[in-house]
């Protein structure tokens, strides 16, 4: 297998490419930009594409995938595509319809991976972020074990090859793993993970359960105004990463991506810039030494860019626990 398409074997037997292309973009970026960027990513060698119903771009991402299949660049089975169940569809009866809606937008027959996007449940309906007249979120109370059973049915129906979770803490993972009658374990937990929040304890726990940790915001953050503290430090300007970049004649972004691959984390790289999309594929062309890895480990300072404070309150808010 050529280095570009290195994969990790999931606990259900399917394979996931260790480098993924993230398609989320801030609200002000036109959605059709996802079409061009995803095509460029596939042309550059990305085979793992990550999106979600929340991102409002699945019709464009699907169009990009289908156009690259149509022109012979890839076959459908070469692509590993991830979608995610949004919080307003946690009730078991809404899970399959939500996935079917994503598939309709994508014009695909199945997704390779379907994730519970975030463990806090929101009021069902068309509104992605339902709020009351005071601007407070409208929550729902759903047993995530029931949501998981509906996810398992989506796998059995062939609509999703694999199923997993995102933004779950250890307690929430254990709740699923210890569920009576569990049919399929989550194959992965996709979480914010980068040198400033290296998730060591969660990573060790996931490894012990044969669950893959997938890193989003691996390059720091998109720093989108409503969501991210504008005073938080910029990861890619970190002096240690910059020094290592100089040493290896690479970019700080490549150092941050390579760090994750060497600790057994699947990493998502998001860029809509053609040069950087191509650049990020070079992560397989070099290695960090154990000293380099130790230096990056030393950067961990528990900085979470995406705290999603508006979701705080319900017991399922995941970021109150240590990990």
Swiss-Prot record:
Known pathway: Steroid metabolism
UniProt: substrate binding residues: 24, 117, 222, 227
Keyword list, A-Z: Cytoplasm, Lipid metabolism, NADP, Oxidoreductase
Active site: 55 (proton donor)
Matching InterPro entries: AKR, AKR1C, Aldo/ket_reductase_CS, NADP_OxRdtase_dom, NADP_OxRdtase_dom_sf
GO biological process: bile acid metabolic process; digestion
Activity control note: Potently inhibited by benzbromarone and 3',3'',5',5''-tetrabromophenolphthalein (TBPP).
Subunit relationships: Monomer.
Function: Cytosolic aldo-keto reductase that catalyzes the NADH and NADPH-dependent reduction of ketosteroids to hydroxysteroids. Most probably acts as a reductase in vivo since the oxidase activity measured in vitro is inhibited by physiological concentrations of NADPH. Displays a broad positional specificity acting on positions 3, 17 and 20 of steroids and regulates the metabolism of hormones like estrogens and androgens. May also reduce conjugated steroids such as 5alpha-dihydrotestosterone sulfate. Displays affinity for bile acids.
Similarity section: Belongs to the aldo/keto reductase family.
Name this protein carries in UniProt: Aldo-keto reductase family 1 member C1
Organismal lineage: Eukaryota, Metazoa, Chordata, Craniata, Vertebrata
């Amino acid at each position: 297998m050529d280095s570009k398409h290195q994969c990790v074997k999931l606990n259900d037997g399917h394979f996931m490419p260790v480098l993924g292309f993230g398609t989320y973009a801030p609200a002000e970026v036109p959605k059709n930009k996802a079409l061009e960027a995803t095509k460029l990513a596939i042309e550059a060698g990305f085979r793992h594409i990550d999106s979600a119903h929340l991102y409002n771009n699945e019709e464009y991402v699907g169009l990009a995938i289908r156009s690259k299949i149509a022109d012979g660049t890839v076959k459908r089975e070469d692509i590993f595509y991830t979608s995610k169940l949004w919080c307003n569809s946690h009730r078991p009866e809404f899970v399959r319809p939500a996935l079917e809606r994503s598939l309709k937008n994508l014009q695909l027959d199945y997704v390779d991976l379907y994730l519970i996007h975030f463990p806090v449940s929101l009021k069902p309906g068309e509104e992605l972020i339902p709020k009351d007249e005071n601007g407070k979120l409208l929550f729902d109370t759903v047993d995530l074990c029931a949501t998981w059973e509906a996810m398992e049915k989506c796998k059995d129906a062939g609509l999703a090859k694999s199923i997993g979770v995102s933004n779950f803490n250890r307690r929430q993972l254990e709740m699923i793993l210890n569920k009576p009658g569990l049919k399929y374990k989550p194959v992965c937990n996709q979480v914010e993970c980068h040198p400033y929040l290296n998730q060591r304890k969660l990573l060790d726990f996931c490894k012990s359960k044969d669950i893959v940790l997938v890193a989003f915001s691996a390059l720091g953050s998109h720093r989108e105004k409503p969501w991210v503290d504008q005073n938080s430090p910029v990861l890619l300007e970190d002096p240690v990463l910059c020094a290592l970049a100089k040493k290896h004649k690479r970019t700080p972004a490549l150092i941050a991506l390579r760090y994750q691959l060497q600790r057994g984390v699947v990493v998502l790289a998001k860029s809509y810039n053609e040069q950087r999309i191509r650049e990020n594929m070079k992560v397989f062309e070099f290695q960090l030494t154990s000293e380099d890895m130790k230096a990056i480990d030393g950067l961990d300072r528990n900085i979470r860019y995406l705290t999603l404070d508006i979701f705080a309150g319900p017991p399922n808010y995941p970021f109150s626990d240590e990990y």
